[in-house]
Amino acid sequence: MLNFCANNYLGLSNHPRLIKASQEMMNRRGYGMSSVRFICGTQDIHKELEAAISDYFQTEDTILYAACFDANGGVFEPLFSEEDAIISDSLNHASIIDGVRLCKAKRYRYANADMKDLERCLQEAQAQRFRIIVTDGVFSMDGNVAPMDQICDLAEKYDALVMVDESHSAGVVGATGHGVSELYNTYGRVDIYTGTLGKAFGGALGGFTTGRKEIIDLLRQRSRPYLFSNSLAPGIIGASLEVFKMLKESNALHDKLVENVSYFRDKMMAAGFDIKPTQSAICAVMLYDAKLSQIYATRMQEEGIYVTGFYLSLIHISEPTR
Protein backbone atom coordinates (compact mmCIF):
# COMPACT_ATOMS: atom_id res chain seq x y z
CA MET A 1 0.00 0.00 0.00
CA LEU A 2 1.37 3.41 -1.03
CA ASN A 3 0.47 6.02 1.59
CA PHE A 4 -0.55 9.36 0.07
CA CYS A 5 -2.06 11.01 3.15
CA ALA A 6 0.46 10.73 5.99
CA ASN A 7 2.37 13.76 7.27
CA ASN A 8 5.67 11.97 6.68
CA TYR A 9 6.83 14.87 4.51
CA LEU A 10 10.55 14.06 4.45
CA GLY A 11 10.16 10.28 4.49
CA LEU A 12 11.90 9.99 7.85
CA SER A 13 9.42 7.87 9.80
CA ASN A 14 11.04 4.63 8.64
CA HIS A 15 14.52 5.95 7.88
CA PRO A 16 17.21 3.48 9.00
CA ARG A 17 19.29 6.21 10.67
CA LEU A 18 16.36 7.19 12.90
CA ILE A 19 15.52 3.60 13.76
CA LYS A 20 19.15 2.94 14.70
CA ALA A 21 19.43 6.15 16.73
CA SER A 22 16.23 5.35 18.61
CA GLN A 23 17.34 1.80 19.41
CA GLU A 24 20.78 2.91 20.55
CA MET A 25 19.33 5.59 22.82
CA MET A 26 16.94 3.07 24.41
CA ASN A 27 19.84 0.67 24.96
CA ARG A 28 21.66 3.40 26.87
CA ARG A 29 18.80 5.24 28.61
CA GLY A 30 15.93 2.76 28.82
CA TYR A 31 12.34 2.79 27.56
CA GLY A 32 10.72 5.58 29.58
CA MET A 33 11.44 8.36 32.07
CA SER A 34 8.70 7.48 34.61
CA SER A 35 8.53 11.11 35.69
CA VAL A 36 7.54 14.62 34.74
CA ARG A 37 10.32 17.02 33.79
CA PHE A 38 10.62 19.01 37.02
CA ILE A 39 10.98 15.97 39.31
CA CYS A 40 13.44 13.54 37.70
CA GLY A 41 12.36 13.51 34.06
CA THR A 42 14.97 15.89 32.69
CA GLN A 43 18.20 14.41 31.34
CA ASP A 44 20.96 15.92 29.26
CA ILE A 45 19.36 14.47 26.12
CA HIS A 46 16.19 16.55 26.65
CA LYS A 47 18.25 19.71 26.95
CA GLU A 48 20.25 18.68 23.89
CA LEU A 49 17.08 18.30 21.81
CA GLU A 50 15.72 21.63 23.04
CA ALA A 51 18.99 23.27 21.97
CA ALA A 52 18.79 21.60 18.53
CA ILE A 53 15.25 22.91 18.00
CA SER A 54 16.29 26.41 19.08
CA ASP A 55 19.17 26.29 16.61
CA TYR A 56 16.85 25.16 13.81
CA PHE A 57 14.35 27.97 14.39
CA GLN A 58 16.99 30.57 15.32
CA THR A 59 15.35 31.17 18.71
CA GLU A 60 16.65 31.65 22.24
CA ASP A 61 15.12 28.67 24.04
CA THR A 62 12.75 25.70 23.66
CA ILE A 63 10.45 23.66 25.89
CA LEU A 64 9.40 20.09 24.99
CA TYR A 65 5.89 18.67 25.31
CA ALA A 66 4.33 15.25 24.80
CA ALA A 67 2.56 16.60 21.68
CA CYS A 68 1.98 19.87 19.85
CA PHE A 69 -1.62 19.70 21.08
CA ASP A 70 -0.15 20.11 24.57
CA ALA A 71 2.16 22.89 23.43
CA ASN A 72 -0.76 24.87 22.01
CA GLY A 73 -2.99 23.96 24.92
CA GLY A 74 -0.41 25.09 27.45
CA VAL A 75 0.88 28.35 25.98
CA PHE A 76 -1.92 30.89 26.46
CA GLU A 77 -3.17 30.50 30.04
CA PRO A 78 0.27 31.00 31.66
CA LEU A 79 1.02 34.12 29.59
CA PHE A 80 -2.24 36.05 29.20
CA SER A 81 -5.07 37.22 31.46
CA GLU A 82 -8.38 39.07 31.15
CA GLU A 83 -6.38 42.26 30.55
CA ASP A 84 -4.99 40.88 27.29
CA ALA A 85 -6.22 39.99 23.79
CA ILE A 86 -5.69 36.89 21.65
CA ILE A 87 -6.34 37.45 17.94
CA SER A 88 -6.66 34.10 16.17
CA ASP A 89 -7.07 33.05 12.53
CA SER A 90 -10.49 31.50 11.90
CA LEU A 91 -8.98 28.31 10.47
CA ASN A 92 -6.40 27.67 13.17
CA HIS A 93 -5.92 24.11 14.42
CA ALA A 94 -8.25 22.72 17.08
CA SER A 95 -5.42 22.65 19.62
CA ILE A 96 -5.04 26.43 19.33
CA ILE A 97 -8.79 26.89 19.68
CA ASP A 98 -8.84 24.74 22.82
CA GLY A 99 -5.80 26.50 24.25
CA VAL A 100 -7.41 29.91 23.76
CA ARG A 101 -10.58 28.67 25.49
CA LEU A 102 -8.55 27.84 28.60
CA CYS A 103 -7.36 31.43 28.83
CA LYS A 104 -9.29 34.40 30.24
CA ALA A 105 -7.97 36.85 27.65
CA LYS A 106 -10.40 38.68 25.37
CA ARG A 107 -10.78 36.75 22.12
CA TYR A 108 -10.88 38.03 18.57
CA ARG A 109 -11.12 35.95 15.41
CA TYR A 110 -10.20 37.20 11.94
CA ALA A 111 -11.16 35.66 8.59
CA ASN A 112 -8.58 33.21 7.26
CA ALA A 113 -5.43 35.06 6.15
CA ASP A 114 -7.47 38.26 5.71
CA MET A 115 -5.15 41.12 6.63
CA LYS A 116 -7.87 43.77 6.56
CA ASP A 117 -9.92 41.79 9.05
CA LEU A 118 -6.82 41.18 11.17
CA GLU A 119 -6.15 44.92 11.25
CA ARG A 120 -9.74 45.54 12.32
CA CYS A 121 -9.27 43.14 15.25
CA LEU A 122 -5.99 44.79 16.21
CA GLN A 123 -7.64 48.20 16.23
CA GLU A 124 -10.47 46.92 18.42
CA ALA A 125 -7.96 45.35 20.83
CA GLN A 126 -5.89 48.48 21.44
CA ALA A 127 -7.33 48.96 24.92
CA GLN A 128 -5.97 45.60 26.06
CA ARG A 129 -2.63 45.34 27.89
CA PHE A 130 -0.94 42.80 25.58
CA ARG A 131 -2.06 41.59 22.16
CA ILE A 132 -0.94 38.42 20.38
CA ILE A 133 -1.68 37.33 16.80
CA VAL A 134 -1.90 33.54 16.49
CA THR A 135 -1.82 31.62 13.21
CA ASP A 136 -0.99 28.27 11.68
CA GLY A 137 2.04 28.49 9.40
CA VAL A 138 0.34 26.12 6.95
CA PHE A 139 -3.37 25.40 7.30
CA SER A 140 -3.70 21.65 7.33
CA MET A 141 -6.94 21.17 5.41
CA ASP A 142 -6.03 23.15 2.28
CA GLY A 143 -2.27 23.72 2.50
CA ASN A 144 -2.47 27.51 2.34
CA VAL A 145 0.47 29.38 3.86
CA ALA A 146 -0.08 32.26 6.28
CA PRO A 147 1.32 35.60 4.99
CA MET A 148 3.80 35.98 7.83
CA ASP A 149 5.48 39.12 6.48
CA GLN A 150 2.17 40.99 6.43
CA ILE A 151 1.18 39.59 9.83
CA CYS A 152 4.46 40.78 11.33
CA ASP A 153 4.04 44.21 9.72
CA LEU A 154 0.64 44.60 11.38
CA ALA A 155 1.97 43.26 14.67
CA GLU A 156 4.66 45.93 14.70
CA LYS A 157 2.20 48.64 13.68
CA TYR A 158 -0.20 47.78 16.52
CA ASP A 159 2.35 46.60 19.12
CA ALA A 160 1.34 42.93 19.17
CA LEU A 161 3.19 39.68 19.72
CA VAL A 162 3.17 36.97 17.03
CA MET A 163 2.79 33.20 17.47
CA VAL A 164 2.86 30.65 14.66
CA ASP A 165 2.20 26.89 14.72
CA GLU A 166 4.81 25.38 12.39
CA SER A 167 3.47 21.82 12.50
CA HIS A 168 2.82 21.58 8.75
CA SER A 169 5.39 24.16 7.62
CA ALA A 170 8.64 23.30 9.44
CA GLY A 171 10.72 20.98 7.31
CA VAL A 172 8.55 21.83 4.32
CA VAL A 173 8.26 25.48 3.24
CA GLY A 174 11.10 27.89 2.66
CA ALA A 175 14.20 27.57 0.49
CA THR A 176 15.71 24.94 2.80
CA GLY A 177 12.49 23.88 4.53
CA HIS A 178 12.97 25.89 7.71
CA GLY A 179 9.36 27.08 7.76
CA VAL A 180 7.41 30.27 7.27
CA SER A 181 10.02 32.55 8.84
CA GLU A 182 12.51 31.39 6.22
CA LEU A 183 9.92 31.72 3.45
CA TYR A 184 9.00 35.30 4.42
CA ASN A 185 12.27 36.31 6.14
CA THR A 186 10.56 37.01 9.46
CA TYR A 187 13.29 35.69 11.75
CA GLY A 188 13.41 37.85 14.86
CA ARG A 189 9.87 39.11 14.26
CA VAL A 190 7.99 36.03 15.53
CA ASP A 191 7.88 35.73 19.32
CA ILE A 192 6.57 32.18 19.76
CA TYR A 193 6.73 29.09 17.54
CA THR A 194 5.00 25.82 18.32
CA GLY A 195 5.53 22.62 16.40
CA THR A 196 5.58 18.85 16.37
CA LEU A 197 8.04 16.00 16.03
CA GLY A 198 5.21 13.93 14.55
CA LYS A 199 5.21 15.17 10.96
CA ALA A 200 8.30 16.21 8.96
CA PHE A 201 10.61 15.68 11.94
CA GLY A 202 10.33 11.90 12.13
CA GLY A 203 6.61 11.21 12.32
CA ALA A 204 6.40 9.77 15.85
CA LEU A 205 5.24 12.09 18.65
CA GLY A 206 6.37 15.04 20.71
CA GLY A 207 5.76 18.77 20.55
CA PHE A 208 7.59 21.94 21.43
CA THR A 209 7.33 25.67 21.98
CA THR A 210 10.34 27.76 21.01
CA GLY A 211 10.98 31.48 21.13
CA ARG A 212 12.14 34.24 23.43
CA LYS A 213 13.88 33.01 26.58
CA GLU A 214 11.71 34.96 29.02
CA ILE A 215 8.59 33.39 27.50
CA ILE A 216 10.01 29.86 27.67
CA ASP A 217 11.15 30.43 31.27
CA LEU A 218 7.61 31.41 32.24
CA LEU A 219 6.15 28.35 30.51
CA ARG A 220 8.53 26.07 32.41
CA GLN A 221 7.11 27.45 35.64
CA ARG A 222 3.41 27.62 34.73
CA SER A 223 2.47 25.52 31.68
CA ARG A 224 0.41 22.62 33.03
CA PRO A 225 0.85 20.14 30.14
CA TYR A 226 4.62 20.52 30.65
CA LEU A 227 4.49 20.32 34.44
CA PHE A 228 2.15 17.35 34.70
CA SER A 229 2.98 15.12 31.70
CA ASN A 230 5.77 12.55 31.53
CA SER A 231 8.95 13.50 29.73
CA LEU A 232 9.50 12.39 26.16
CA ALA A 233 10.88 8.86 26.05
CA PRO A 234 14.57 8.30 25.24
CA GLY A 235 13.77 6.50 21.98
CA ILE A 236 11.89 9.56 20.69
CA ILE A 237 14.69 11.87 21.83
CA GLY A 238 17.36 9.77 20.13
CA ALA A 239 15.57 9.68 16.78
CA SER A 240 14.69 13.38 16.96
CA LEU A 241 18.30 14.37 17.61
CA GLU A 242 19.27 12.37 14.54
CA VAL A 243 16.63 14.23 12.49
CA PHE A 244 18.11 17.63 13.23
CA LYS A 245 21.61 16.28 12.61
CA MET A 246 20.54 15.02 9.18
CA LEU A 247 18.81 18.28 8.27
CA LYS A 248 21.95 20.20 9.18
CA GLU A 249 24.11 17.92 7.04
CA SER A 250 22.15 18.31 3.80
CA ASN A 251 19.07 19.79 2.11
CA ALA A 252 18.62 16.66 -0.01
CA LEU A 253 15.46 15.47 1.76
CA HIS A 254 13.76 18.84 1.35
CA ASP A 255 14.88 19.12 -2.28
CA LYS A 256 13.35 15.71 -3.00
CA LEU A 257 10.10 16.76 -1.30
CA VAL A 258 9.86 19.88 -3.46
CA GLU A 259 10.53 17.79 -6.57
CA ASN A 260 7.85 15.24 -5.63
CA VAL A 261 5.23 17.88 -4.81
CA SER A 262 5.82 19.71 -8.10
CA TYR A 263 5.64 16.47 -10.07
CA PHE A 264 2.40 15.40 -8.38
CA ARG A 265 0.70 18.77 -8.83
CA ASP A 266 1.71 19.05 -12.48
CA LYS A 267 0.56 15.54 -13.38
CA MET A 268 -2.74 15.82 -11.49
CA MET A 269 -3.58 19.19 -13.05
CA ALA A 270 -2.65 17.88 -16.49
CA ALA A 271 -5.13 15.04 -15.87
CA GLY A 272 -7.86 17.59 -15.23
CA PHE A 273 -8.02 17.62 -11.42
CA ASP A 274 -8.64 20.79 -9.42
CA ILE A 275 -5.79 21.28 -6.93
CA LYS A 276 -5.50 24.37 -4.76
CA PRO A 277 -2.29 26.30 -5.53
CA THR A 278 -0.10 26.55 -2.42
CA GLN A 279 3.57 26.70 -1.43
CA SER A 280 3.20 23.77 0.97
CA ALA A 281 3.31 20.00 0.52
CA ILE A 282 -0.42 19.59 1.13
CA CYS A 283 -2.19 18.95 -2.18
CA ALA A 284 -5.95 19.30 -1.69
CA VAL A 285 -7.65 17.55 -4.62
CA MET A 286 -11.07 19.22 -4.85
CA LEU A 287 -14.04 16.99 -5.76
CA TYR A 288 -16.89 19.16 -4.40
CA ASP A 289 -19.00 16.13 -3.45
CA ALA A 290 -18.85 14.26 -0.13
CA LYS A 291 -20.10 10.95 -1.51
CA LEU A 292 -17.77 11.12 -4.50
CA SER A 293 -14.79 11.76 -2.23
CA GLN A 294 -15.52 8.54 -0.33
CA ILE A 295 -15.94 6.58 -3.57
CA TYR A 296 -12.61 7.90 -4.84
CA ALA A 297 -10.88 7.01 -1.56
CA THR A 298 -12.26 3.47 -1.58
CA ARG A 299 -11.32 2.86 -5.21
CA MET A 300 -7.82 4.24 -4.68
CA GLN A 301 -7.29 1.97 -1.69
CA GLU A 302 -8.41 -1.00 -3.79
CA GLU A 303 -5.66 -0.02 -6.23
CA GLY A 304 -3.06 0.07 -3.46
CA ILE A 305 -2.98 3.84 -2.87
CA TYR A 306 -4.07 5.01 0.58
CA VAL A 307 -5.96 8.32 0.56
CA THR A 308 -8.72 9.77 2.74
CA GLY A 309 -11.69 11.89 1.68
CA PHE A 310 -12.28 14.91 3.94
CA TYR A 311 -15.69 16.49 4.23
CA LEU A 312 -17.79 18.65 6.53
CA SER A 313 -17.08 17.00 9.88
CA LEU A 314 -13.34 17.72 9.57
CA ILE A 315 -13.22 21.00 7.65
CA HIS A 316 -14.91 24.35 7.86
CA ILE A 317 -18.63 24.11 7.12
CA SER A 318 -18.41 26.49 4.15
CA GLU A 319 -15.53 24.70 2.46
CA PRO A 320 -16.04 22.26 -0.43
CA THR A 321 -15.12 18.60 -0.19
CA ARG A 322 -11.68 17.28 -1.04
Task: Tell where the protein language model's regions lie, with residue ranges.
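N-terminal "arm"/small-domain region of PLP-dependent enzymes with the aminotransferase-like
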Residues: 1-31, 160
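Active-site PLP attachment segment
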Residues: 176, 182-218
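Conserved PLP-binding catalytic core of the aspartate aminotransferase-like
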Residues: 12, 255-303
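Conserved PLP-anchoring active-site segment centered on the Schiff-base-forming lysine
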Residues: 75-94
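PLP-dependent aminotransferase class I/II
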Residues: 201-268, 273-276
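Residue-level detector of conserved catalytic or cofactor/ligand-binding positions
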Residues: 312-322
